[in-house]
Amino acid sequence: MFMKPFLLFGISIMFFVISEAQSYKKIHAEAIVCDTHNDIISTCIEKGYTFDQDLTGKTNSDLNRMLKGGLDVQVFSIFCDGEQKNPYQFANREIDTLYAWVKRNPSKMMLVSSPAQLDEAVKEHKLAAMMGVEGGHMIEDDLSKLDSLYNRGVRYMTLTWNNNTSWATSAEYESGNQQKNGKTDTTSQKKGLNDFGIQVVKRMNKLGMMVDLSHVGDQTFWDAINISTKPILVSHSDCYALCPAFRNLKDDMIIAVGKNGGVIDLNFYPAFLDSTVDAKQKIYIKKHSDEKTALIASGKKDFEADDIIAGKYPKEIEDMQAPFHLLFDHLERIVQLAGIDHVGLGGDFDGIPFTPKVLTDVTKYPMITKELVRQGYSNEDIDKILEGNFIRVFKANQVN
């Protein structure tokens, strides 16, 4: 007895869907999935959390959720803002925090500072925990402190955060957006790297510490990429042509990273993906400013006030979440300008106030692989995006 045509069609569609699901899950499971920027350490210190507890609904990340999302390599950000007193001391506090997490969870995670250790962690099915300093102010204008952070396991440093250092200017400053005490900072500083900044880049090359050009101003970018003898890392940035946020890379910069042999890892922050979000966010902040002021006056901390307001107005937060597909528009632009060998993932989870749609926390990384499969990327190219490009740059920066 022959089946009716529509029944055969339905069965074939069902098998296609099952096959596609099995395909992306297999690719994701077999890949060494790397993310080069996560701020969970500073978030845990600020909020009194610990990484190995269940933080669902409180943060984007925790240990078990990273493992559930198939993450194999996570670079943890060692971060404080430019107002932090004794930033080098705070950096060491954050490093100590990660050390303690690893010590408590030896069967689930491993501290990694070399390609050989990364391979070992992956073979043992442990999260490879790496560290990157976010902001050159944390070395306090002292190369010996840079050396010390390297010796403690730090393997990249962004030359600036949003604030300038005495030796490098930031994207926020160079674009005229830098704020100080609630007002535009009019402090005059020559753009780019000064002589000490050049020494920092050269010292990082010598140590085997990746030079990270996220957050830096245009002139600092060009000074650093022209000085560096090693491939550059851009750990968490997107494309200016698609979303003109001052933190994003212009097309000539993207091309230059490709020529340098470096990698640009995509940031998930909606305001860097979607050009409409910045205006929405400003309206949201202004609308709730009095409410936030009252909460802080009542004794709430800044982050607690933000969390309370966000919890009261979930629809407004949802309206600021960039469409998932925009991440892949940025990815494709980098591929077109620099090549498939020069793009990866640096989500900035727990360093961003809200996420894009779909990518609500670290368990959603498989959705990236699923979409790459749907868009027709080959298994080889997906592996490059998820793992190979960052690992190649990491290896290329090692001292022979």
Give short role names for the model-derived ranges.
Residues 1-24:
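Bacterial Sec-dependent N-terminal signal peptides
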Residues 189-237:
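Loop-centered beta-sheet repeat module
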Residues 21-187, 240, 244-400:
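N-terminal hydrophobic targeting/anchoring segments and the immediately downstream early-domain regions
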